[in-house]
Amino acid sequence: MTGKFITFEGIDGAGKSTHLAWFAQQLEARLAPQGRKVVVTREPGGTPLGERLREVLLHERMHLETEALLMFASRREHIAEVIQPALERGDWVISDRFTDATFAYQGGGRGLAIERLEALEQWVQQGLQPTRTLLFDLAPEVAAARLADARTPDKFEAESAQFFVRTRAEYLRRAAAEPGRFVVIDAARARDDIRKDLEKLLASL
């Protein structure tokens, strides 16, 4: 039996990583009686090579196209070494970001042509798409307030407010274009209210 692939998306500060950890725990409890596992991973990263590329991508300045190509290089390794093998075993994969983040950040935020990203997506993913994508939607000014003084920001977190306005807009455009895959979650609400939504989603999967 093939597993399912769930991705968590949203701009920095939307709280997706916190909710991902809780969601994964709940899913593990549901799948354990079936002898199935939950693989929790992230992008950029997810493999030894991917984690090294993550450090480069998050902290070094580079040409726009170089950044996108490194994102997809890391993703190809991630798919081949982690995601595809897990799905073929019947396990479930939960990833903190996937290709939608590249469209949102490099496409929406940085302005790279969407057509170029689509070509890379087809080549690298070979048809692989998430079963469900949970988009934690939050106004950029609220997200920025949450991140303030939290830690030393990486190069993306340090981007301008307008960068995140464009990034959020591209996320929402993609969600509107694929309503069967995306679940948009209002991340401005209280944690318990968001978890109720996640519980409903778990029951439907």
UniProtKB/Swiss-Prot annotation:
Q: Which InterPro entries match?
A: P-loop_NTPase, Thymidylate_kin-like_dom, Thymidylate_kinase
Q: Does the keyword Transit peptide apply?
A: no
Sorted alphabetically, the Gene Ontology BP terms of this entry are: dTDP biosynthetic process; dTTP biosynthetic process; dUDP biosynthetic process
In Swiss-Prot or TrEMBL terms, this protein is called: Thymidylate kinase
Which EC number(s) are documented for this chain? 2.7.4.9
Role of this protein: Phosphorylation of dTMP to form dTDP in both de novo and salvage pathways of dTTP synthesis.
Q: Name one GO molecular function term.
A: dTMP kinase activity
Gene3D superfamilies found in the cross-reference section: P-loop containing nucleotide triphosphate hydrolases (3.40.50.300)
* Entry similarity comment: Belongs to the thymidylate kinase family.
Instruction: Write down the chemical reaction(s) this protein catalyses.
Output: dTMP + ATP = dTDP + ADP
Q: Does the keyword Membrane apply?
A: no
Q: Give the organism the record lists.
A: Ralstonia nicotianae (strain ATCC BAA-1114 / GMI1000) (Ralstonia solanacearum)
Quote the record's binding site residues for ATP: 10-17
